Amino acid sequence: MKKEKIFIFICLVLLSACSSSLDGIVIEKAADGYKLSIDGRETYIKGVGGTYRLDIAAQSGANAFRTWGGNVEEIKKNLALASEHNMYVMQGIGMTKDSIRYYDDEYKNKMREEVRLLAETFKNDTSLLAWGIGNEIELGNANIAAAWNFVEELAQLIKSIDKRHLVSTVISYNPSALDSVAKYAPSLDYVGINVYGPMGEVQAVVDRSDYKGAFMITEWGPTGWWETASTEWKAPIEQTSEEKRQVYEERYT
């Protein structure tokens, strides 16, 4: 009887260990970079931005979409859409680009309360992939220690409540922002990078930076208006539809 109890106990311990290793979303170092697993299933994210025509996106092979912010009710709607279309959500948490606000206790306390509520409300939702703390905050004047220290604080806050989902931030194509993340926000699971014209240079830029973690392309497309040639009166010259088609194909591969 004693041996039987020991055997049952060992089985329970093993089952518990297996369950904990499979539950949740993790990023792990691999031979050729990083791999993402959802409940033990290796998953390659093929995402779109926003919630417009998710039916077509899903039919085309997309398995995730990204948002830039939202309150509890809006996020519930996003997650319901994700469930309906068998997709995952990278849910944004809006952050200011105004550097002064990162010295403002009123703003920071408001953000702490908001983030705590979101983490507690959605910590077990299986349609949620990740939290994205801020979008390109460095494009204002907030590529400063105070801002990134606060991103790190919020990341730690989320992780103390939500053990299932990943936590990230999204930056523009900006090597200095990568260095800031590496220095001030080590708790992030990955960095999202928004890039258009120099899509093929991203890996090299990451390799040259101080950041050594995982990254995900979170926005991409035709060359941005701020990257194209301009007329003599400084108006950007938009790519033609055919040029856009070509760069979509080139940059996707």
State the predicted function of each range:
Residues 16-17:
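C-terminal motif of bacterial Sec signal peptides marking the signal peptidase cleavage site
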Residues 21-24:
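Boundary at the C-terminal end of the N-terminal hydrophobic targeting segment
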Residues 1-3, 64:
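Generic N-terminal leader/processing signal
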Residues 149-252:
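Extracellular glycoside hydrolase catalytic/binding regions
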Residues 3-9:
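Sec-dependent signal peptide recognition
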Residues 28-31, 35-191, 201:
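Active-site mouth of glycoside hydrolases
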